[in-house]
Amino acid sequence: MLEKFANIFRIPDLRKRVLFTLGLLAVYRFGAFIPTPGINSEALMQYFNANSQSALGLADLFTGGNLRKLTIFALGIMPYITASIIFQLLTVIYEPLAKLQKEGELGRRKITQWTRYVTILLAIVQSFAIGLTLTGSSANMVTIPRGAFIPMCIITLTAGTAFIMWLGEQITERGIGNGMSLLIFTGIVVGLPRGIMDLYGKARDSAWGAFTPIAIAILIVAMVAVVAFIVFVERSERRIPVQYAKRIVGRKMMGGQSTHLPLKVNSGGVMPVIFASSMLSAPLLFAGMSFFGSPKLQDTAFFGPILRAIQPGEPWYEILQITAIIFFAYFYISIVFRPDDIADNMRKYGGFIPGIRPGRRTSDFINDVLTRITLVGALYLCIITVIPTFLISGIHFNHLWLVGPVFDRLPTWMTNGLGVNFYFGGTSLLIVVGVAMDTVQQIESQLIMRHYDGFSPKSGRIRGRRSW
């Protein structure tokens, strides 16, 4: 295994890409130590510790702990993710954007440019909401006048978001892996030591009473089982057999071989979970916003019940999360995987699925198979996301309308969870394992392409023409 890792640095181009990626990730982490001016760090930390199981804890997970310290990268990559979701939805329902996307590289560049503009706009709105929330709080989290802090907060956080967006795009283009996913991955991994220390502190202080050993054992077993389950499903695929007919090209006989079309069970990877979590956590950032003396949104008669109902651990939040994950699983696969194009390419090169007519029938068959396995993949994402969250923060079944009193006798750990933070949740584990596997797979592809052995036992080196 050490020999295979050493191969990475023997290939100049791959070595350059890996070092470039690590360098930009280091720059991203350096920004976590630059606070926004005018912040009372101790008061802000106490506020976040008291609300670690709320939507703030989930939002802080995606920012790598930058939100709880309100650094220049406090918004993280969330505005960019939200903007990307908006434009991907628009390309489906708005015909001019759909045509622009089909124009090739020029059209995609135009959409990317608009996505950046919307990202900046969302960053301005979210930073304004954060400024209003902090200055309107009674916890004395701001040390300078409100009129000076809010513009400074908007400028600082928006500039930080623009820089993070640039970092992610540079990693994707010139580094290894998906830049945006790697930034989220880095933030979660860096926060794991703090999560472990919190877990140790709760166990030492007997915060869970007589059930401390059982609670820790359940958490460890659940995490190991979740990781193993993620690895198993992420490597699972449905293989559709494809046969290529023989044909004569010049003086050579081409085709005649049998192959397969691999369809991953979870073709969308971690993106449906990231999209769903981002969409659910973004509105909750406005919960504490107060417009110059008016009540906070979370205290108003209209928005208050809605915002409280979609907090993590609430039944409606889990229902919305499951619905959003299933929706984005199908939506994402409809964008990245087009059965019509695959069927046309197969027919063009003389390929066909045994028992299925080429053309429209092949496209329908691939679409049917993809629909079924995407449902399995979406349900897998829901299980991975919801069950660990149930163990960690619980689900408040007793808050359900009408049937709530039926659940009053449930054990406390089922309704309140074990009380640890989101770094041990299914969302974080799925992102960490999924992004790590995707990145390793890209490095492995680069190694095999250059005739080196990959990391997995089945990935032997590819022989060049000289060895035939």
Predicted regions and their residues:
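N-terminal cationic and glycine-rich segments that engage phosphates or anionic surfaces
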Residues: 1-101, 105-468
